[in-house]
Amino acid sequence: MNLHQTVEHEAAAAFAAAGIADSPVVLQPTKNAEHGDFQINGVMGAAKKAKQNPRELAQKVADALAGNAVIESAEVAGPGFINLRLRPEFLAQNIQTALNDARFGVAKTDKPQTVVIDYSSPNLAKEMHVGHLRSSIIGDSISRVLEFMGNTVIRQNHVGDWGTQFGMLVAYLVEQQKDNAAFELADLEQFYRAAKVRFDEDPAFADTAREYVVKLQGGDETVLALWKQFVDISLSHAQAVYDTLGLKLRPEDVAGESKYNDDLQAVVDDLVQKGLAVEDDGAKVVFLDEFKNKEGEPAAFIVQKQGGGFLYASTDLACLRYRVGTLHADRLLYVVDHRQALHFEQLFTTSRKAGYLPENVGAAFVGFGTMMGKDGKPFKTRSGDTVKLVDLLTEAVERATALVKEKNPELGADEAAKIGKTVGIGAVKYADLSKNRTSDYVFDWDAMLSFEGNTAPYLQYAYTRVQSVFRKAGEWDADAPTVLTEPLEKQLAAELLKFENVLQSVADTAYPHYLAAYLYQIATLFSRFYEACPILKAEGASRNSRLQLAKLTGDTLKQGLDLLGIDVLDVM
């Protein structure tokens, strides 16, 4: 159920009874549970509009809520706020419904969409580095939530598998194989660096590399076969990282830049024919009045270089047209570094004008900030090199395993390693997903691996604590009527019933930290409930009801963490 929507519906009916049906309710959870569960903040605005006393108008609304089946009490506070407390019977009934539902009371959207989500999308011919972490895990979490809410999600890994760097790499590979017939491409990163040194220092080699670019773009079979070697090994490296992270990205989700090669000229010609692209100094340019510089000149969105070469803009236009026209997207999401914001705004504007992006199709740039080191600079190794993602994840597992062994010295090596992997990978992902994605954040091993505070280990431990209760509980009646008498029982019940609303917010806004914050709230509330309301020592209806709340807490934590791409453990 959508608790927020249900309460808002009751409040709207009370607004109508008070003669202010056209005014928005403005419903929010209370900041202090002692004041109730929700607060109506819309009366002041309505009173100003109707030229009435806000407290008197608020009292009319509160009176209209008397005897309500959902709301137990409505009290006017301050200049015209109304604090609402929900009926325990209403909460209890909905807890029962959620417990008997495989989706824990979360309804699917009544307006399902086909959502194409572009995320991860590393440049190939190099191993993935920490800069690829945010797009990969943010995109994965958003796609999981959208899917869970009933949408059809098409994941697109728009890898950089085309461009001038491949001419350089092919030239170096040919050179190496000439000197050593048994040469194999093992260390991708080392190979790329060596090829770059040759390209920068040897003009003759650079000329050869450029010739290979021409051959590659011309479809030369021998060069294409060598190019495919780089693509295949790069993708296998990437897939290994995705599997370690537990992402849902699969090889069939790869749709690289090369996929759109045959469409690029057609797109440029179409833009010219529609009068959108014009020639400017030999290049084809779309001038956008919506993006003017300080001098008032329209921004130049270049779609074809002087000499006929193509750019990211050309590929992205062809790609967007394909996603709408062939994949039939209702909504497009691009999970990309925030520094690309202007490019995507211009891409969307150009696409709207060209008719590639109809008004009934949504398109959003899902930007994110930078992962920083403790020194406040982008996260690097001590020597200043980019950190390989695989090395970061290996270190996460090693650190977590050491921590697990320290806390549980009696654990066998295999069990400690299994728990260590779940905790370590979960910690890295949650440290990112729990932050507002638009912000930069500091990567801190000690903070993210802590079992206290807003961390994955804390939430994972909260789940194991629930499982521990049920290992000791023995027989109990899961179908017994739920009875809520203690304040923390009601508070926990009300919070558990907000799950659908939170997930809908994530689906609408593409902000996974809303879900992380909710799960942390559930875990901390359960901890307080656990201390204040003995579960196993309680008797009769109270014992069953508290076990029901514990069961739904565990289910919600497990499902919620899964939607963030994080595993749980029964024991840790």
Curated annotation (Swiss-Prot):
PROSITE patterns linked to this entry: AA_TRNA_LIGASE_I
InterPro entries, sorted: aa-tRNA-synth_I_CS (IPR001412), Arg-tRNA-ligase (IPR001278), Arg-tRNA-synth_N (IPR005148), Arg-tRNA-synth_N_sf (IPR036695), ArgRS_core (IPR035684), DALR_anticod-bd (IPR008909), Rossmann-like_a/b/a_fold (IPR014729), tRNAsynth_Ia_anticodon-bd (IPR009080)
Gene this protein is translated from: argS
GO biological process, one term: arginyl-tRNA aminoacylation
Name of the molecule in the record: Arginine--tRNA ligase
Enzyme Commission designation: 6.1.1.19
Classification via Pfam families: Arg_tRNA_synt_N (PF03485), DALR_1 (PF05746), tRNA-synt_1d (PF00750)
Lineage: Bacteria, Pseudomonadati, Pseudomonadota, Betaproteobacteria, Neisseriales
HAMAP family documented for this protein: Arg_tRNA_synth
Organism: Neisseria meningitidis serogroup C / serotype 2a (strain ATCC 700532 / DSM 15464 / FAM18)
